[in-house]
Amino acid sequence: MILTVKPLQGKECSVQVTEDEKVSTVKELVSERLNIPANQQRLLYKGKALSDEHRLSDYSIGPEAKLNLVIRPVGERTGASGTAASSSSSSQGRVWQTVSTILARHFSPADAAKVHEQLIKDYERSLRQLSLDDIERLAGRLLHPDGEGMDTSYMD
């Protein structure tokens, strides 16, 4: 099958693969065609990041599919940097602690724990369901709050 790989900025390329190929193989083919090292590539399908060790069939990627390519800056690790991760983790911990404190004021300890647990599950589910389009819209709203020079007709 033929897949189209489109960088966020730049020319797209097509690669011929089977549905049993691993994502890492697709990255190697893209590397040959676009001269972008595989370790700097992040492939997305329908807004979801693809993991190197998984097969295309694991993501139900079929013929004629279009993958988006995000190019990582040189030196950026696959995961978040240690400082950013710990900072984000500690601020997230503070948020959940604040939520827990507020719930404790209004519910019994058992009920507060249930509500707290459900809030965390719902939050994590919502994050997993974010697509690249959702993130781009959010970024556009944050970076251009006045909507200057931006087509806002598609925004809800």
Swiss-Prot record:
Domain of life (superkingdom): Eukaryota
Main localization category: cytoplasm
GO cellular component: BAT3 complex; cytosol; nucleus
Subcellular localization(s) per the UniProt record: Cytoplasm, Cytosol; Nucleus
Signal sequence residues: none
Residue span, Ubiquitin-like domain: 1-76
Keywords from the UniProt entry: Cytoplasm, Nucleus, Transport
Listed PROSITE patterns: UBIQUITIN_1, UBIQUITIN_2
One annotated GO molecular function: protein-folding chaperone binding
GO BP annotations listed: post-translational protein targeting to endoplasmic reticulum membrane; tail-anchored membrane protein insertion into ER membrane
PANTHER family in alphabetical order: UBIQUITIN-LIKE PROTEIN 4A
Functional summary from the UniProt entry: As part of a cytosolic protein quality control complex, the bag6/bat3 complex, maintains misfolded and hydrophobic patches-containing proteins in a soluble state and participates in their proper delivery to the endoplasmic reticulum or alternatively can promote their sorting to the proteasome where they undergo degradation. The bag6/bat3 complex is involved in the post-translational delivery of tail-anchored/type II transmembrane proteins to the endoplasmic reticulum membrane.
Record note on quaternary structure: Component of the bag6/bat3 complex.
Full protein name: Ubiquitin-like protein 4A
Species whose genome carries this gene: Anoplopoma fimbria
